[in-house]
Amino acid sequence: MRRSPSQELAPGTWAPARRIAERVLGPIERFLHVEAASGVVLLVASAVALAWANSPWGDAYEHLWHVPITLGVGSLAFTQPLHFWINEGLMTIFFFVAGLEIRREIHEGELSDLKRAALPIAAAVGGMIAPALLYLSLNASPASRHGWGVPMATDIAFAVGVLALLGKRVPPALRVLLLALAIIDDIGAIIVIALFYSSGVVWSGLLVAAGGALAVGVLQRFGVRSPAAYVAPGAVVWWGMLRAGVHPTIAGVAIGLLTPVRSWFGSQGFVAAARDAVDRVAALTERDGHRADELLKPLGRIRQAQREALPPVVRLQAALHPWVAYGIMPLFAFANAGVRIDASSLGHAASGTILLGVTLGLVAGKPLGVFLASFAMVRLGVCALPRGVGWRGIAVVGCVAGIGFTMAIFIAGLAFGDAAMLAAAKLGVLLASAVAAVVGLLVGRLALSGAPAPGAALTLAEAEGSTEQ
């Protein structure tokens, strides 16, 4: 039935729909923007922690993280130091967001197609193996070799931040490649943590975690849409992992991977629901003497339709990512980057080789592994370089991938129980990350030109499919 002029949609009526389109079409641009800006916050938090730890008030810094915090009441109370709640509690949310990113990439991103994923997978694997081997070549003793996983990690916030400083020199396809590489690197780090940096498995704990995961699946099956309903079963998964001897942050990854990638509403369902609600708003506003509170229900329906038109994985990532980037990660850096630099803290016999192994692993091993693995895969014909990206661009990605920082510090905390060895590993991470950032900037300025190469992908949308050659 044809609408009368009074029923035609007024300008701005579809503003919610436009906002949804922007959120669906531009997730990578926003992701890169948040990551680049959060790198500055991370840097400030780390600098403050390092300065405080080496000041006359350094003991207060150490004591702060041992303050006991209790959650729960009575027999259900659980008491742990503040440092635990940051590293094992809040970091679970970080790993949950990482799980969401991985889930999206597998469904619709660079990891959804094997040919597109081949290059970033090869680069990431090479960038993990080479640093680990370089570290082990310098740390063969049982006391220090357990830290081989430390130089494998890449901090996506700092890496993307360095690329952002290079401005228009960096082609969009190179940014997408770095993003995909970093996500695969996260997958590798998660596997390493689960397999090599967790204590002996207690099967009863795994059964508890499996029960929590099953509850999540049941809620999804019955169409429960409120995120709050999933907090309790998610906490059960976390508790089960902790009791099982598996690092509890893995629970965040597991729940992230279980998050639905399809929206509750299809596009047609959203249009129908929104149109019906808009028609009701139009009818109410045309009626004399209508009350403002009568608009609450149809406007609420529009908001609900807008919310449910987005897949849960997209909506949760958009909601949590800024909190993780600007809150959890800087807090983690502040709690873990405060390394006291003196003879007593670095006096362990193995400290020197640990520091050297971590530093060289990130600064030299990362770019070498990324470049050689990419070169081998392209020469073997398994994949092709993205449009507009040359070998100089791959070298730049390898350099900035050596910025390990937060994830490397996280693994160091799992690898070393000795305070001096942990301090050496953290210092190596901080030193290597600073050097890798400077080298990445210098190589980027020298190797990348401001003009796009012929046939280069000019937008992120083009860049996402540019490896399908």
UniProtKB/Swiss-Prot annotation:
Membrane-topology descriptor: Multi-pass membrane protein
Where does this one sit in the cell?
Cell inner membrane
- Keywords assigned by UniProt, alphabetized: Antiport, Cell inner membrane, Cell membrane, Ion transport, Membrane, Sodium, Sodium transport, Transmembrane, Transmembrane helix, Transport
Note whether Transport occurs among the keywords: yes
- What does this gene product do? Na(+)/H(+) antiporter that extrudes sodium in exchange for external protons.
**What does the sequence similarity comment in the record state about its family?**
Belongs to the NhaA Na(+)/H(+) (TC 2.A.33) antiporter family.
| Gene field | nhaA1
The catalytic activity, as recorded, is: Na(+)(in) + 2 H(+)(out) = Na(+)(out) + 2 H(+)(in)
- What protein am I looking at? Na(+)/H(+) antiporter NhaA 1
Record-linked Gene3D superfamilies: Na+/H+ antiporter like domain (1.20.1530.10)
One Gene Ontology term of the biological-process aspect is: regulation of pH
**A Gene Ontology cellular-component term:** plasma membrane
Gene Ontology molecular function terms on file: sodium:proton antiporter activity
- Lineage, top-rank taxon, reads Bacteria
